[in-house]
């Protein structure tokens, strides 16, 4: 215990942190290394050291000595804390502004400097009794603010600023010129029309299936769980490729229609039709999950009251249930609208001549003519549309209350749906199940064929090309990279999500709503825009981290941060605050309270967030497609390259492997989470 106390007191010493930064300045590069620590030459390493010559980086560390001199001024505790905060702000601003002006990319020692300044700011705020002087909470809050600023706010601002620059020249008129082009106007209108259509149809299908699982199904309700898992584990491009195998030029449905009905338009799929079909297949489950939860929260006693007043089933549904679902319906439409706007993979496979914003941004960056100005302008437009929708959803729908559950214990039974609606839903679900069965069957079968539409001979060549060339060739490097990056990103996502949730739910401070809003903003920023903004923000001074695995991990963490936060917020809402207060009253620190009280009780929710974050990190493409290199390529980028080269069989085979792997991971974690819950029999014995 004494050794632990001594270690803790060491970390709570400002002298320790200042000394650590000075040691880092001597031992680590203060300027960025183009080829990293392991591959840089001795001369490159020496040139990057801050002490190797008189340079700007010395001035970033020199003011730290001021913290050793402050006690000699014998200021009051409050005054000294304010002076320290002023000095910390000066060092941070001076370092980043000077690095930007003089094009100096920051090195590893600056990371230690930022950590030191965060620790010193924590001590200063503790002296001012912020958060009751709880250093752990203050430090966690400051770390989260820095994380959000550097990797959400800063890149978002960077993409807006860059659209007014033509290279190094300030050219605001180019925005009007780019947006005034007829082609760009058509791309924007295509995207908005497609997203609106997909949003409406996906919400209709989602409502139908939610009504089936909550009002019709008895033994077949498990279909809802399968329905909600499939889109999560399906990698990008795979749904689009599966639709192509069925309905494309050489698809078996197209050939059947041609043979028996004389259907000759074999290109009908490529364009709006194909993108809409693929997106509805991918996003209707999102609507289902939203509306399924909303329907389960409607108290059956309301329906019984309607029948008691002699209303028939049609009147009850359209006048009672449907109005209560309006917030969820609007929420579903807006979320699917954003997802459709941001979708990159399906338009790339099925778009044909129907161009949308997300793919056009990709072509501006990865195409033959590099055009950052047009990419950032279109990215800004896409971001503006997404942010407007997100703000409407967050501020309007989020603040509306349609409470139907009171404190009374009577539950009642849900009533039957109108017969016409019931049979319509059953027909819709039957069609959907058959279509999805054929779709995924085509995907798995297609991965074993020589050439779909030409030669259906079964073969293992596609899998041999992927995994039969050794660990250093084929798909192995991308799969290993993906597992490593996702394995690092998922725990960080859950950890930061827990910290943010604990601070937002359990602590009161100015700016709490802003912090929560900015964290949820990660969901609103389309993946393509996030990728472009990271290139613009981190491809030059002051922070140069493009081309590294670090930026990919950061992108994965920031994209999925709301998942961990929302899971922890939901769990904390079920834990009485008196548990925390009891721990703190026994002189337990906030860190011990979180680790020994909160974390064990939130384990099921956090494990679910962990596996969801892991799977999303495994399947992300639009946010990282611009960030990967030959050395950091991930699975989805490998699939994208195969699609671009026309190697559909190899791409489908890789997608099939990922589906199986991720389904196994989800089922494994579902089994673990099931074991972490207390069985009812044990709970009764404990009582």
Curated annotation (Swiss-Prot):
Keywords from the UniProt entry: Cell inner membrane, Cell membrane, Ion transport, Iron, Iron transport, Membrane, Repeat, Transmembrane, Transmembrane helix, Transport
Membrane topology: Multi-pass membrane protein
Keyword Nucleotidyltransferase: no
Keyword set includes Membrane: yes
Domain of life: Bacteria
Transmembrane stretches, start-end: 10-30, 50-70, 85-105, 106-126, 141-161, 192-212, 226-246, 271-291, 318-338, 347-367, 378-398, 425-445, 450-472, 484-504, 517-537, 538-558, 594-614, 620-640, 649-669
Cross-referenced InterPro entries: MetI-like, MetI-like_sf
Database matches in Gene3D superfamilies: MetI-like
CC terms in the record's Gene Ontology section: plasma membrane
Family: Belongs to the binding-protein-dependent transport system permease family. FbpB subfamily.
Name this polypeptide is given: Ferric transport system permease protein FbpB
Record lineage: Bacteria, Pseudomonadati, Pseudomonadota, Gammaproteobacteria, Pasteurellales
